[in-house]
Regions:
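Conserved catalytic/acceptor-binding region of the Class I
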Residues: 8, 126-180
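Conserved alpha-helix/loop element of class I SAM-dependent methyltransferases that forms part
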Residues: 9-28, 43
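Class I SAM-dependent methyltransferase SAM/SAH-binding core
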Residues: 31, 37-87
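A short acidic, Gly/Pro-enriched loop at the edge of an enzyme's catalytic core
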Residues: 87-96
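Residues lining the SAM
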Residues: 98-103, 128
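A short glycine-rich, Lys/Arg-flanked "PGG" loop and its adjoining helix->strand segment in the class I
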Residues: 109-124
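Conserved Class I S-adenosyl-L-methionine
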Residues: 154, 166-214
Length: 214
């Protein structure tokens, strides 16, 4: 299995499973759409190496530059300031990836369609999005009022198909725990609230692995 340098990422396992499925390797070109803090870009850059290329894409120039600096230690990096709905790359890539992006955009279908158009024929699109209200803290449903589409993960396989992609695999995974540990730490970082000893089931993360048709 591909080993990613994401030791503190409680959602790393479904990403590793997805990358194993598509065979990410040295020399690939990939786009991290909505790259955020850059942990995933940096980890994947280590795999594609100096012969590969990373497109670090974010609507926030500061976040984009942070990602580019992190990934540049391992691969060629092109930093682009773009919203997902406006995604346009200078060349086709082997993989377009996003995680925790579609819940915030205006139109998830437009972003997925753009991602599909950004990859080469038979290229890969990997998307990971939550079903926020399926998460629980002490048995109480979680919410994310600031998100436009907090449960977009539940629609993800259908959205991928409507974007013209061929869905190869789709599944959901939810980290869970009680008391001190990575799950509680992740929730505290996300919300600013320590759950203490309450049982926590984080929002299931739906992963879709899809391909652009020939």
């Amino acid at each position: 299995m591909i080993e990613l340098g994401l030791r503190n990422d409680v959602y790393r396992r479904p990403l590793m499973t997805a990358l194993d499925r598509l065979g990410l390797r040295e020399g690939w070109r990939f786009a991290d759409v909505g790259a955020g803090g850059g942990d995933v870009s940096g980890a994947l850059a280590e795999i594609v190496g100096r012969d590969g290329r990373v497109y670090a894409i974010d609507s926030d120039p500061a976040a984009r530059d942070q990602v580019a600096e992190l990934a540049a230690a391992s691969a060629q990096v092109v930093a682009i300031t773009q919203a997902g709905e406006d995604l346009l790359l200078p060349e086709p890539v082997d993989l377009a990836f996003c995680r925790f992006l579609l819940l915030h955009v205006h139109d998830p279908l437009v972003v997925l369609t753009r991602m599909g158009g950004a990859v080469r024929p038979r290229g890969w699109v990997v998307v990971q999005e939550p079903i926020t209200t399926a998460g629980r803290v002490g048995g109480v449903a979680m919410s994310m009022p600031e998100a436009r589409h907090p449960d977009v993960g539940a629609l993800l396989p259908s959205l991928a198909r409507h974007a013209g992609l061929a869905v190869v695999a789709a599944w959901a995974e939810a980290p869970a725990g009680a008391g001190p540990g990575p799950v509680a730490e992740y929730l505290a970082h996300l919300t600013g609230v320590d759950p203490g000893d309450d049982p926590v089931v984080l929002p299931p993360l739906v992963t879709v692995v899809a391909r652009r048709p020939d």
